[in-house]
Amino acid sequence: GFIPWDDDADIAMLYEDYKRFIVALKQDLPQEYTFQCFDTDKRYNPLIPGMKIRKKGTYLKEVNTLLANRCTECDGIFIDVFVYDYCSASKTMDLPLRMLNQLIMPFIILFDNLGMNPVFLKRWFVSNARMYGKLNEGSKKIGFDLTWTFKSPLKPFIFDYDDIYPVQYVPFEDTQLPIAHHPHEYLCTAIAPSYMTLPPEEEQKPKHIVDIRL
Protein backbone atom coordinates (compact mmCIF):
# COMPACT_ATOMS: atom_id res chain seq x y z
CA GLY A 1 0.00 0.00 0.00
CA PHE A 2 0.88 3.68 0.14
CA ILE A 3 3.47 5.03 2.54
CA PRO A 4 1.53 7.60 4.63
CA TRP A 5 4.27 10.24 4.45
CA ASP A 6 4.86 9.76 0.71
CA ASP A 7 1.35 10.34 -0.54
CA ASP A 8 1.75 10.03 -4.29
CA ALA A 9 2.61 7.55 -7.02
CA ASP A 10 4.81 8.31 -10.02
CA ILE A 11 5.35 6.86 -13.48
CA ALA A 12 8.74 7.03 -15.19
CA MET A 13 9.74 6.06 -18.72
CA LEU A 14 12.43 6.67 -21.29
CA TYR A 15 11.83 9.54 -23.71
CA GLU A 16 11.55 7.12 -26.64
CA ASP A 17 8.61 5.47 -24.83
CA TYR A 18 7.21 8.82 -23.69
CA LYS A 19 6.72 9.90 -27.32
CA ARG A 20 4.68 6.75 -28.00
CA PHE A 21 2.83 7.23 -24.71
CA ILE A 22 1.53 10.64 -25.84
CA VAL A 23 0.15 9.08 -29.03
CA ALA A 24 -1.52 6.32 -27.01
CA LEU A 25 -3.08 8.80 -24.57
CA LYS A 26 -4.55 10.87 -27.40
CA GLN A 27 -6.24 7.75 -28.74
CA ASP A 28 -7.09 5.69 -25.68
CA LEU A 29 -7.29 7.84 -22.52
CA PRO A 30 -10.80 7.51 -21.03
CA GLN A 31 -12.97 10.65 -21.15
CA GLU A 32 -12.89 11.14 -17.38
CA TYR A 33 -9.13 11.82 -17.55
CA THR A 34 -6.93 14.38 -19.26
CA PHE A 35 -3.20 14.87 -19.58
CA GLN A 36 -1.02 17.97 -19.52
CA CYS A 37 2.51 18.36 -20.91
CA PHE A 38 4.63 20.93 -22.72
CA ASP A 39 4.54 18.83 -25.89
CA THR A 40 0.81 19.54 -26.31
CA ASP A 41 0.30 22.76 -24.31
CA LYS A 42 2.93 25.51 -24.24
CA ARG A 43 1.46 26.91 -20.99
CA TYR A 44 2.75 23.82 -19.19
CA ASN A 45 5.88 24.41 -17.16
CA PRO A 46 8.60 21.89 -18.15
CA LEU A 47 10.33 22.38 -14.79
CA ILE A 48 7.74 20.16 -13.14
CA PRO A 49 7.53 16.45 -14.08
CA GLY A 50 7.23 15.94 -17.83
CA MET A 51 3.50 15.17 -17.71
CA LYS A 52 0.54 15.08 -15.36
CA ILE A 53 -2.40 12.73 -15.97
CA ARG A 54 -5.41 14.22 -14.17
CA LYS A 55 -8.91 13.08 -13.28
CA LYS A 56 -11.62 15.51 -14.31
CA GLY A 57 -14.19 16.63 -11.76
CA THR A 58 -11.71 16.54 -8.87
CA TYR A 59 -9.42 19.16 -7.32
CA LEU A 60 -5.96 19.06 -5.79
CA LYS A 61 -3.81 21.91 -4.53
CA GLU A 62 -0.13 21.02 -4.22
CA VAL A 63 2.47 22.21 -1.73
CA ASN A 64 4.08 24.34 -4.41
CA THR A 65 4.29 28.13 -4.27
CA LEU A 66 6.53 28.83 -7.28
CA LEU A 67 5.28 26.52 -10.03
CA ALA A 68 1.52 26.99 -10.37
CA ASN A 69 -0.61 24.96 -12.78
CA ARG A 70 -1.16 27.21 -15.82
CA CYS A 71 -3.26 24.61 -17.64
CA THR A 72 -6.31 25.82 -15.79
CA GLU A 73 -8.91 23.65 -17.53
CA CYS A 74 -8.20 20.94 -14.97
CA ASP A 75 -6.72 21.05 -11.46
CA GLY A 76 -7.69 17.48 -10.66
CA ILE A 77 -5.86 14.77 -8.77
CA PHE A 78 -2.99 13.45 -10.85
CA ILE A 79 -0.15 11.05 -11.43
CA ASP A 80 3.22 12.56 -12.38
CA VAL A 81 5.05 11.13 -15.36
CA PHE A 82 8.84 11.58 -15.20
CA VAL A 83 10.87 11.40 -18.39
CA TYR A 84 14.17 9.50 -18.34
CA ASP A 85 16.80 9.58 -21.06
CA TYR A 86 20.25 8.28 -21.86
CA CYS A 87 23.09 9.85 -19.87
CA SER A 88 26.85 10.11 -20.10
CA ALA A 89 29.07 8.47 -17.49
CA SER A 90 31.65 11.21 -18.13
CA LYS A 91 31.37 14.40 -16.05
CA THR A 92 33.09 16.30 -18.87
CA MET A 93 30.33 15.29 -21.29
CA ASP A 94 27.54 15.46 -18.73
CA LEU A 95 27.98 18.87 -17.13
CA PRO A 96 27.78 21.50 -19.94
CA LEU A 97 24.14 21.01 -20.98
CA ARG A 98 23.11 20.09 -17.44
CA MET A 99 24.60 23.35 -16.12
CA LEU A 100 23.01 25.34 -18.96
CA ASN A 101 19.54 24.10 -18.00
CA GLN A 102 20.34 24.82 -14.35
CA LEU A 103 21.01 28.45 -15.37
CA ILE A 104 17.85 28.74 -17.50
CA MET A 105 15.62 27.32 -14.77
CA PRO A 106 15.37 30.42 -12.48
CA PHE A 107 14.48 32.66 -15.43
CA ILE A 108 11.58 30.39 -16.39
CA ILE A 109 10.37 30.57 -12.76
CA LEU A 110 10.80 34.37 -12.69
CA PHE A 111 8.83 35.06 -15.87
CA ASP A 112 6.16 32.52 -14.93
CA ASN A 113 5.60 34.24 -11.59
CA LEU A 114 5.43 37.62 -13.32
CA GLY A 115 2.47 36.27 -15.28
CA MET A 116 4.43 35.84 -18.52
CA ASN A 117 4.79 32.65 -20.53
CA PRO A 118 8.48 32.37 -21.54
CA VAL A 119 7.88 29.95 -24.42
CA PHE A 120 11.28 30.69 -25.99
CA LEU A 121 13.10 29.80 -22.77
CA LYS A 122 10.94 26.70 -22.31
CA ARG A 123 11.69 25.49 -25.85
CA TRP A 124 15.41 26.10 -25.34
CA PHE A 125 15.31 24.29 -22.00
CA VAL A 126 13.49 21.25 -23.41
CA SER A 127 15.60 21.12 -26.59
CA ASN A 128 18.77 21.00 -24.48
CA ALA A 129 17.38 17.95 -22.69
CA ARG A 130 16.48 16.25 -25.97
CA MET A 131 19.89 17.04 -27.47
CA TYR A 132 21.65 15.57 -24.44
CA GLY A 133 19.61 12.36 -24.66
CA LYS A 134 20.29 12.07 -28.39
CA LEU A 135 24.04 12.58 -27.90
CA ASN A 136 24.09 9.72 -25.39
CA GLU A 137 21.66 7.39 -27.14
CA GLY A 138 22.50 3.75 -26.47
CA SER A 139 24.45 4.52 -23.29
CA LYS A 140 24.34 2.01 -20.44
CA LYS A 141 23.49 4.93 -18.13
CA ILE A 142 20.02 6.48 -17.90
CA GLY A 143 18.41 8.99 -15.59
CA PHE A 144 15.99 11.86 -15.17
CA ASP A 145 16.18 13.94 -18.33
CA LEU A 146 17.74 17.40 -18.16
CA THR A 147 14.40 19.14 -17.57
CA TRP A 148 14.58 17.90 -13.95
CA THR A 149 16.80 20.54 -12.35
CA PHE A 150 15.84 20.14 -8.67
CA LYS A 151 18.98 18.16 -7.93
CA SER A 152 22.62 19.19 -7.80
CA PRO A 153 24.12 18.98 -11.32
CA LEU A 154 27.22 17.55 -9.66
CA LYS A 155 25.21 14.62 -8.25
CA PRO A 156 22.41 13.94 -10.74
CA PHE A 157 20.07 10.96 -10.69
CA ILE A 158 21.91 8.53 -12.99
CA PHE A 159 21.27 4.78 -12.95
CA ASP A 160 22.73 1.73 -14.65
CA TYR A 161 20.38 0.75 -17.47
CA ASP A 162 20.51 -2.87 -16.29
CA ASP A 163 19.32 -1.87 -12.81
CA ILE A 164 16.01 -0.72 -14.31
CA TYR A 165 15.46 -2.90 -17.40
CA PRO A 166 13.94 -5.33 -17.93
CA VAL A 167 11.33 -4.20 -15.42
CA GLN A 168 9.69 -6.69 -13.08
CA TYR A 169 6.04 -6.74 -11.99
CA VAL A 170 5.03 -6.78 -8.33
CA PRO A 171 1.62 -6.79 -6.58
CA PHE A 172 0.30 -3.43 -5.38
CA GLU A 173 -3.20 -3.27 -3.88
CA ASP A 174 -5.33 -5.12 -6.47
CA THR A 175 -3.02 -4.90 -9.49
CA GLN A 176 0.48 -5.63 -10.78
CA LEU A 177 2.83 -2.70 -11.37
CA PRO A 178 6.24 -2.51 -13.07
CA ILE A 179 9.26 -1.58 -10.95
CA ALA A 180 13.02 -1.49 -11.50
CA HIS A 181 14.77 -4.78 -12.23
CA HIS A 182 17.07 -4.15 -9.25
CA PRO A 183 14.95 -2.02 -6.89
CA HIS A 184 17.57 -1.81 -4.12
CA GLU A 185 20.21 -0.30 -6.41
CA TYR A 186 17.62 2.03 -7.93
CA LEU A 187 16.36 3.27 -4.54
CA CYS A 188 19.88 3.81 -3.20
CA THR A 189 20.36 6.37 -5.97
CA ALA A 190 16.82 7.77 -6.26
CA ILE A 191 16.28 8.12 -2.48
CA ALA A 192 19.36 7.25 -0.40
CA PRO A 193 21.12 4.10 0.81
CA SER A 194 19.12 4.57 4.03
CA TYR A 195 15.76 4.40 2.20
CA MET A 196 14.50 1.68 4.59
CA THR A 197 15.10 3.86 7.65
CA LEU A 198 11.90 5.37 9.04
CA PRO A 199 11.80 9.18 9.26
CA PRO A 200 11.23 10.78 12.68
CA GLU A 201 7.62 10.37 13.84
CA GLU A 202 6.89 14.10 13.47
CA GLU A 203 7.80 13.83 9.76
CA GLN A 204 5.55 10.84 9.11
CA LYS A 205 2.75 12.83 7.51
CA PRO A 206 1.62 13.71 3.96
CA LYS A 207 3.84 16.31 2.32
CA HIS A 208 2.46 16.95 -1.18
CA ILE A 209 -1.14 18.07 -0.65
CA VAL A 210 -2.67 21.29 0.71
CA ASP A 211 -6.28 20.65 -0.31
CA ILE A 212 -8.09 17.86 -2.12
CA ARG A 213 -11.68 17.33 -3.28
CA LEU A 214 -12.84 14.09 -4.84
Q: Where are the regions a protein language model picked out?
A:
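Catalytic metal-binding acidic patch
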Residues: 1-22, 174
